[in-house]
From Swiss-Prot:
GO terms for molecular function: mechanosensitive monoatomic ion channel activity. HAMAP family: MscL. It comes from Haemophilus influenzae (strain PittGG). It is found in: Cell inner membrane. Keywords: Cell inner membrane, Cell membrane, Ion channel, Ion transport, Membrane, Transmembrane, Transmembrane helix, Transport. It is a multi-pass membrane protein. Homopentamer. This is Large-conductance mechanosensitive channel. Belongs to the MscL family. GO terms for cellular component: plasma membrane.
Length: 128
């Protein structure tokens, strides 16, 4: 029972719950960005590059033989994934900038001046 109680306390801490929510939202956001890239950006890029479909861009290393499929390097899909990453990284960067701007800056505690410290020390010594 002690193990379950410890796990429950760990799982219900604010940071763990926040992280779990972030992972879920991030996963959904990743799917949206992937769709944006594959369904909107790459077709437009294909038109601009002469009708090239990025999904079909690949190097054939070994031709298909019978039931064995061809061995290919799918660099077109890799390009799509790089575009996905760049968009997601940029969106996260912008969100962090906004969060940091909105977050209340912590007030810096200024160290007392030397004169103030000396005065306090003098007063403490007088009281002894």
């Amino acid at each position: 029972m002690n193990f379950i109680k410890e796990f429950r306390e760990f799982a219900m801490r604010g940071n763990v719950v926040d992280m779990a929510i972030g992972v879920i939202i991030g996963s959904a956001f990743g799917k949206i960005v992937s769709s944006l890239v594959s369904d909107i950006f790459t077709p437009v890029l294909g038109i601009l590059t002469g009708g090239i479909d990025f999904k079909d861009m690949k190097f054939v290393l070994a031709q298909a033989q019978g039931d064995v499929p061809a061995v290919t390097l799918n660099y077109g899909l890799f390009i799509q994934n790089v575009i996905d990453f760049i968009i997601i990284a940029f969106a996260i960067f912008m969100m962090i900038k906004v969060i940091n701007k909105v977050r209340k800056p912590e007030e810096k505690k200024t160290a007392p001046k030397a004169e103030t410290l000396l005065t306090e020390i003098r007063d403490l010594l007088k009281n002894k």
